[in-house]
Amino acid sequence: SIWIAQREGRAKDSNDRTQDSVLKMLAIGGEGDVIDRLMEMNIAPLAISYEYDPCDFLKAQEFQLKRDIPDYKKTTDDDLLNMQTGLLGYKGRVCFRMASCINEDLGELERTLPKPELFVAISALIDKRIHANYRIFATNYVAHDLLYKEERFVEHYTAEDKKRFISYIDGQLERITLPNKDVDFLREKLLLMYANPLTNYLAATK
Protein backbone atom coordinates (compact mmCIF):
# COMPACT_ATOMS: atom_id res chain seq x y z
CA SER A 1 0.00 0.00 0.00
CA ILE A 2 1.07 3.62 -0.49
CA TRP A 3 0.07 6.97 1.00
CA ILE A 4 -0.45 9.97 -1.25
CA ALA A 5 -1.46 13.52 -0.34
CA GLN A 6 -4.82 14.78 -1.60
CA ARG A 7 -3.28 18.10 -2.68
CA GLU A 8 0.00 20.00 -2.84
CA GLY A 9 0.42 21.26 0.72
CA ARG A 10 -2.23 22.09 3.30
CA ALA A 11 -4.80 24.79 2.60
CA LYS A 12 -3.87 27.99 4.41
CA ASP A 13 -7.40 28.39 5.78
CA SER A 14 -7.67 24.67 6.72
CA ASN A 15 -10.39 24.18 4.11
CA ASP A 16 -8.60 21.19 2.60
CA ARG A 17 -9.95 19.87 -0.70
CA THR A 18 -8.77 17.09 -2.99
CA GLN A 19 -7.13 18.37 -6.16
CA ASP A 20 -8.63 16.92 -9.32
CA SER A 21 -5.12 16.78 -10.81
CA VAL A 22 -4.10 14.13 -8.25
CA LEU A 23 -6.97 11.89 -9.36
CA LYS A 24 -6.19 12.50 -13.03
CA MET A 25 -2.62 11.39 -12.40
CA LEU A 26 -3.78 8.22 -10.62
CA ALA A 27 -6.23 7.37 -13.42
CA ILE A 28 -3.89 8.10 -16.31
CA GLY A 29 -3.22 4.45 -17.18
CA GLY A 30 -4.72 1.00 -16.75
CA GLU A 31 -7.62 -1.06 -18.02
CA GLY A 32 -11.19 0.18 -18.30
CA ASP A 33 -12.50 3.68 -17.65
CA VAL A 34 -11.60 6.21 -14.94
CA ILE A 35 -13.85 4.53 -12.36
CA ASP A 36 -12.40 1.08 -13.07
CA ARG A 37 -8.83 2.37 -12.75
CA LEU A 38 -9.49 4.09 -9.44
CA MET A 39 -11.41 1.12 -8.05
CA GLU A 40 -8.37 -1.08 -8.71
CA MET A 41 -6.45 1.07 -6.21
CA ASN A 42 -8.89 0.46 -3.33
CA ILE A 43 -8.63 4.07 -2.16
CA ALA A 44 -9.28 4.59 1.57
CA PRO A 45 -9.23 8.29 2.58
CA LEU A 46 -7.26 9.20 5.70
CA ALA A 47 -8.25 12.13 7.92
CA ILE A 48 -5.50 13.77 10.00
CA SER A 49 -6.69 16.21 12.67
CA TYR A 50 -4.46 18.57 14.65
CA GLU A 51 -5.41 20.32 17.86
CA TYR A 52 -3.04 23.17 16.98
CA ASP A 53 -1.36 24.23 13.74
CA PRO A 54 2.14 25.52 14.54
CA CYS A 55 2.20 27.38 11.21
CA ASP A 56 -1.06 29.24 11.84
CA PHE A 57 0.58 32.62 12.52
CA LEU A 58 2.76 32.28 9.40
CA LYS A 59 -0.31 31.51 7.29
CA ALA A 60 -2.20 34.49 8.73
CA GLN A 61 0.80 36.71 8.02
CA GLU A 62 0.89 35.47 4.42
CA PHE A 63 -2.83 36.25 4.03
CA GLN A 64 -2.17 39.89 4.92
CA LEU A 65 0.93 40.11 2.73
CA LYS A 66 -1.04 38.78 -0.25
CA ARG A 67 -3.85 41.21 0.51
CA ASP A 68 -1.53 44.21 0.73
CA ILE A 69 1.00 43.25 -1.98
CA PRO A 70 -0.77 41.82 -5.06
CA ASP A 71 2.38 40.26 -6.54
CA TYR A 72 3.71 38.93 -3.21
CA LYS A 73 5.57 35.62 -3.43
CA LYS A 74 7.16 33.63 -0.64
CA THR A 75 10.96 33.33 -0.66
CA THR A 76 12.96 30.12 -0.24
CA ASP A 77 13.72 31.22 3.33
CA ASP A 78 9.98 31.61 3.97
CA ASP A 79 9.37 28.05 2.75
CA LEU A 80 12.16 26.70 4.95
CA LEU A 81 10.77 28.50 8.00
CA ASN A 82 7.31 27.07 7.30
CA MET A 83 8.74 23.54 6.98
CA GLN A 84 10.79 23.86 10.15
CA THR A 85 7.88 25.31 12.13
CA GLY A 86 5.49 22.65 10.82
CA LEU A 87 7.84 19.80 11.69
CA LEU A 88 9.04 20.98 15.10
CA GLY A 89 6.20 23.20 16.33
CA TYR A 90 3.58 22.24 18.92
CA LYS A 91 0.54 20.43 17.50
CA GLY A 92 -1.15 19.26 20.67
CA ARG A 93 -3.17 16.12 20.09
CA VAL A 94 -3.07 14.57 16.61
CA CYS A 95 -5.66 12.07 15.40
CA PHE A 96 -5.44 9.71 12.39
CA ARG A 97 -8.69 8.13 11.18
CA MET A 98 -8.92 5.84 8.17
CA ALA A 99 -12.22 5.83 6.28
CA SER A 100 -13.46 2.71 4.52
CA CYS A 101 -12.62 2.03 0.88
CA ILE A 102 -14.59 4.25 -1.52
CA ASN A 103 -15.11 1.57 -4.21
CA GLU A 104 -18.82 1.13 -3.47
CA ASP A 105 -19.43 4.87 -3.79
CA LEU A 106 -17.31 5.06 -6.95
CA GLY A 107 -19.45 2.34 -8.48
CA GLU A 108 -22.58 4.46 -7.96
CA LEU A 109 -21.22 7.45 -9.92
CA GLU A 110 -22.48 8.15 -13.43
CA ARG A 111 -19.69 6.86 -15.67
CA THR A 112 -20.92 8.78 -18.70
CA LEU A 113 -20.27 12.17 -17.11
CA PRO A 114 -17.72 14.36 -18.93
CA LYS A 115 -14.31 13.69 -17.37
CA PRO A 116 -13.97 17.13 -15.74
CA GLU A 117 -17.34 16.68 -13.99
CA LEU A 118 -16.50 13.10 -13.03
CA PHE A 119 -13.24 14.12 -11.36
CA VAL A 120 -15.06 16.88 -9.47
CA ALA A 121 -17.59 14.32 -8.23
CA ILE A 122 -14.85 11.90 -7.14
CA SER A 123 -12.98 14.68 -5.33
CA ALA A 124 -16.17 15.65 -3.50
CA LEU A 125 -16.72 12.02 -2.50
CA ILE A 126 -13.22 11.76 -1.04
CA ASP A 127 -13.52 15.13 0.71
CA LYS A 128 -16.78 14.10 2.36
CA ARG A 129 -15.18 10.93 3.72
CA ILE A 130 -12.19 12.85 5.07
CA HIS A 131 -14.26 15.64 6.60
CA ALA A 132 -16.66 13.17 8.24
CA ASN A 133 -13.71 11.51 9.97
CA TYR A 134 -12.18 14.66 11.44
CA ARG A 135 -11.60 14.65 15.19
CA ILE A 136 -13.08 17.93 16.41
CA PHE A 137 -11.23 19.50 19.33
CA ALA A 138 -12.30 22.22 21.77
CA THR A 139 -10.10 24.60 19.75
CA ASN A 140 -12.38 24.12 16.75
CA TYR A 141 -15.60 24.66 18.71
CA VAL A 142 -14.29 27.77 20.46
CA ALA A 143 -12.93 29.24 17.22
CA HIS A 144 -16.27 28.71 15.43
CA ASP A 145 -18.22 30.43 18.20
CA LEU A 146 -15.76 33.33 18.39
CA LEU A 147 -15.63 33.79 14.62
CA TYR A 148 -19.40 33.85 14.18
CA LYS A 149 -20.08 35.59 17.52
CA GLU A 150 -22.39 32.92 18.88
CA GLU A 151 -22.57 30.25 21.58
CA ARG A 152 -23.77 27.43 19.37
CA PHE A 153 -21.19 24.92 20.59
CA VAL A 154 -20.74 26.08 24.17
CA GLU A 155 -21.54 22.61 25.51
CA HIS A 156 -18.41 21.25 23.77
CA TYR A 157 -15.88 23.31 25.72
CA THR A 158 -15.34 24.77 29.17
CA ALA A 159 -14.72 28.36 30.20
CA GLU A 160 -11.10 27.34 30.77
CA ASP A 161 -10.88 25.90 27.23
CA LYS A 162 -12.12 29.21 25.83
CA LYS A 163 -9.76 31.27 27.96
CA ARG A 164 -6.81 29.08 26.98
CA PHE A 165 -7.60 29.31 23.26
CA ILE A 166 -8.07 33.09 23.31
CA SER A 167 -4.71 33.37 25.09
CA TYR A 168 -3.16 31.11 22.46
CA ILE A 169 -4.51 33.23 19.59
CA ASP A 170 -3.26 36.40 21.27
CA GLY A 171 0.17 34.80 21.59
CA GLN A 172 0.24 33.80 17.92
CA LEU A 173 -0.73 37.34 16.91
CA GLU A 174 2.25 38.61 18.90
CA ARG A 175 4.53 36.40 16.79
CA ILE A 176 3.50 38.20 13.59
CA THR A 177 6.04 40.93 12.85
CA LEU A 178 4.45 42.90 10.01
CA PRO A 179 5.08 46.66 10.22
CA ASN A 180 1.44 47.46 9.40
CA LYS A 181 -0.14 44.58 11.31
CA ASP A 182 -3.92 44.47 10.81
CA VAL A 183 -4.79 42.70 14.05
CA ASP A 184 -8.52 42.34 13.37
CA PHE A 185 -7.88 40.83 9.92
CA LEU A 186 -5.20 38.49 11.25
CA ARG A 187 -7.34 37.36 14.19
CA GLU A 188 -10.22 36.56 11.83
CA LYS A 189 -7.91 34.48 9.63
CA LEU A 190 -6.57 32.57 12.63
CA LEU A 191 -10.08 31.83 13.88
CA LEU A 192 -11.14 30.74 10.40
CA MET A 193 -8.30 28.19 10.27
CA TYR A 194 -9.64 26.51 13.39
CA ALA A 195 -13.34 26.91 12.55
CA ASN A 196 -13.20 25.43 9.03
CA PRO A 197 -12.56 21.81 10.06
CA LEU A 198 -15.74 21.96 12.17
CA THR A 199 -17.67 23.65 9.34
CA ASN A 200 -16.62 20.89 6.94
CA TYR A 201 -17.33 18.15 9.49
CA LEU A 202 -20.87 19.43 10.01
CA ALA A 203 -21.49 19.60 6.25
CA ALA A 204 -20.19 16.05 5.76
CA THR A 205 -22.20 14.49 8.58
CA LYS A 206 -25.57 16.22 8.26
List PLM regions with ranges:
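Membrane-interfacial terminal anchoring regions of lipid-handling membrane enzymes
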Residues: 1-2, 9-206
